């Protein structure tokens, strides 16, 4: 598990430094010094800890990584983020995508453990059998379906994640309000889901444009919210159930975002 977490962190940190993971510091921010090795990750333009705090941290054995970036973070709510890398990788640390680019820009399975197609229209995605939420519940194809439907909701109205290429989704990229299913997204079993496109699509396009950006959310936790509430609920700024290796502890759009390790990370 430690090896897998380290690999994921390395990938995320590489992406952060190259593609701007999270928010920038103000113009009068102090330059962040290299942190002690960490369990908490702070993406910031400011020094995350004072000298005294750093000394206490080192003494206690905590491990902290500070990352300075140049862009500001729009949101960490998966339902309202755009397709910029800064937002994507900030969310990735909490809510895993189906696949991700590795350090060599090859696709690596993350939440999924296989994606197959025989006709470049029907894409069969299998969710890793070991995948669980931080509360111990299994991550299922129903979570993936729910997340897709809400991202394509006209009430949520995320205009950057365009799903009009899938059967059952309107040309405007939205499903009907309150939709519980569409023909282009079919759950086969608890761990398998099929995506069907209107026209043939290469596997590379499916993975890079859709599987990389579909952050699966815990249906059993958030289905109590109305579609309108999905864009305004504070829960998404401090989620207590995640699938990724980290959880947000503190967040300021213009300055920083801080994470702590998810002790129940399944990888």
What are these regions (language model features)?
Residues 113-160:
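Aromatic- and charge-enriched surface segment that lines or borders ligand/interaction sites
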Residues 201, 209-267:
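Gly/Pro-rich hinge or "lid" segments in bacterial periplasmic/extracellular proteins
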Residues 24-33:
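Bacterial lipoprotein signal-peptidase II cleavage site
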Residues 116, 161-223, 250-252:
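Surface-exposed binding/hinge segments that line
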Residues 68-119, 149, 241:
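N-terminal lobe/hinge region of extracytoplasmic solute-binding protein
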Residues 2-9:
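Bacterial N-terminal signal peptides that target proteins for export
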Residues 61-71, 122-126, 144-147, 193-194, ...:
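Short, well-ordered beta-strand elements
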């Amino acid at each position: 598990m430690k090896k897998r977490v380290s690999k994921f962190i390395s990938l995320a940190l590489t992406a952060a430094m190259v593609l701007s993971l999270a928010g920038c510091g103000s113009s009068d921010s102090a330059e962040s010094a290299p942190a002690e090795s960490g369990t908490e990750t702070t993406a910031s333009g400011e020094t995350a800890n004072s000298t005294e705090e750093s000394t206490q941290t080192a003494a206690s054995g905590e491990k902290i990584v500070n990352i300075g970036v140049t862009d500001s973070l729009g949101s960490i709510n998966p339902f309202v983020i755009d397709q910029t890398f800064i937002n994507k990788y900030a969310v990735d640390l909490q809510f895993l995508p189906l696949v991700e680019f590795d350090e060599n820009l090859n696709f690596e399975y993350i939440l999924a453990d296989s994606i197959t197609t025989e006709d470049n229209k029907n894409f069969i995605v299998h969710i890793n059998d070991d995948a669980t939420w931080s509360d111990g519940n299994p991550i299922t194809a129903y979570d993936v379906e729910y997340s897709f439907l809400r991202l394509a909701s006209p009430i949520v109205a995320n205009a950057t994640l365009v799903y009009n290429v899938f059967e059952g989704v309107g040309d405007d990229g939205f499903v009907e309000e309150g939709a519980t299913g569409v023909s282009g997204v079919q759950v086969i079993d608890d761990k398998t889901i099929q995506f069907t496109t209107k026209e043939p699509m290469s596997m590379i396009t499916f993975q890079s444009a859709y599987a990389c950006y579909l952050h699966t959310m815990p249906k059993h936790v958030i289905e109590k919210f109305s579609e309108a509430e999905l864009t305004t609920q504070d829960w998404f700024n401090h989620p207590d159930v995640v699938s990724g290796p980290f959880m947000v502890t503190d967040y300021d759009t213009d300055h920083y975002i801080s994470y702590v390790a998810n002790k129940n990370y399944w990888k």
